[in-house]
Design a protein with these regions (language model features):
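ABC ATPase NBD Q-loop/coupling interface
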Residues: 76-101
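Conserved ABC ATPase signature
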Residues: 164-169, 173
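A short, proline-enriched helix->beta-strand linker immediately N-terminal to the Walker B motif
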Residues: 184-188
Length: 353
């Protein structure tokens, strides 16, 4: 990613999202799904933070709260306004005027390029809609802006695409349209929710390269949501690993991948496929299934599956995420403040790519 001034663009503090479980029309809910629980992180200008974890861990819910598609139960999200350079408290935005202003700085690229577009609208209408909603430019100016963006995202020549419909495009072309729609307002922060997961492998790398190039050209900051560590390594400056609503490890990409500390991160890395079919990577074994996210006890969320759990893990609250050497943070009772493992013998990871 491009080196900018190191200014914090996104600051998340104690973010929490609880979904009540309905008990009927006249009974108050006492049980809650802790989808996101006390999540905090910062993203600097020009950086890309990868939010990694298995399905259901709270990645997408976190992203939706950052762009105010979902309201938080608790916590704060501050995002720097592109126009005034001031930090906006996202959860306090209420009026339509403030929401429209907020959308100029923040956008989202959705996972499914087949479901996130209105099939009855042309490509021009889809990409130009944010400009129309904001009342920006004349029809001719909007058309020129759309043409320029289609060219920028690699749909050339752009003119034949303007009056096509989504069903006339391939999956890769639709995702390029989704990227163009997200960038038409020139946002400074974009949440990308697994934008390549539904595309053919042959197309994924071109979309990822495109997003990196646009970050360099336009200075866009990304929160990149993915379950694929290989994608996160290619796309992101930093990675945060999420498990059952909690961030369990976070750090610079190479530091985290070369020296994973949390048992869950190590298990994820050991499961990454190796290109050499004759080589079998040593597996980090974890037992059981993911624990229930309904009213979870105040313990380590990974306790039920961790092969190294000790009495401290069972008796103490979930460990805080704090630095264990450099900018590398991990939430584990068995990692010392210097980043040393004290939890017993582990399988040595062979991280050959």
């Amino acid at each position: 990613m491009s080196e900018q001034n190191g200014q914090v663009r996104v600051k998340v503090d104690g973010l929490r999202k609880l979904f009540p479980i309905s008990k009927g029309l006249f009974r108050k809910s006492t049980d809650f799904v802790y989808a996101v629980d006390d999540v905090s992180f910062e993203i600097k200008a020009g950086e890309s933070l990868g939010l990694v974890g298995e399905s259901g861990c709270g990645k997408t819910t976190t992203g939706r709260m950052l762009v105010k598609l979902d309201d938080a139960t608790d916590g704060e999200v501050h995002i720097r306004n592109a126009g005034t350079d001031e930090m906006i408290e996202v959860m306090s935005i209420q009026s339509k005027v403030d929401q429209k202003e907020f959308r100029k700085s923040v956008q989202m690229i959705f996972q499914d390029p087949y479901e996130s577009m209105n099939p009855r609208r042309t490509i021009f209408d889809i990409v130009a809609e944010p400009l129309s909603v904001q009342g920006i430019g004349t029809t001719e100016e909007r058309e020129q802006r759309v043409v320029d963006l289609l060219r920028l995202v690699g749909l050339t020549p752009p003119e034949p695409f303007l009056f096509r419909y989504p069903h006339e495009l391939s999956g890769g072309q639709r995702q390029r349209i989704a990227i163009a729609r997200a960038l038409v307002m020139e946002p400074t922060f974009v949440v990308a929710d697994e934008p390549t997961s539904m595309l053919d492998v042959s197309i994924r790398i071109s979309i990822m390269r495109l997003m990196l190039e646009l970050a360099e050209k336009l200075g866009v900051t990304y929160l990149y949501i993915t379950h694929d560590l290989a994608v996160a390594r290619y796309m992101c400056d930093k990675i945060a690993v999420m498990y059952l609503g909690k961030i369990v490890e976070m750090g610079p990409t190479e530091s985290l991948l070369e020296n994973p500390m949390h048992p869950y991160t190590r298990a994820l890395l050991s499961a990454v496929p190796v290109p050499d079919p004759s080589y079998r990577r040593p597996q980090v074994e974890i037992e059981g299934g993911v624990a229930r996210a309904i009213n979870p006890p105040d313990q380590c969320r990974f306790l039920q599956r961790c092969p190294f759990a000790v009495d401290q893990c069972r008796n103490d609250p979930h460990p805080d995420l704090y630095e264990r050497g450099g900018d590398h943070q991990v939430a584990c009772h068995l990692v010392t403040s210097e980043g040393n493992w004290v939890g017993g013998e582990r399988v040595e990871l062979d991280l050959r790519s």
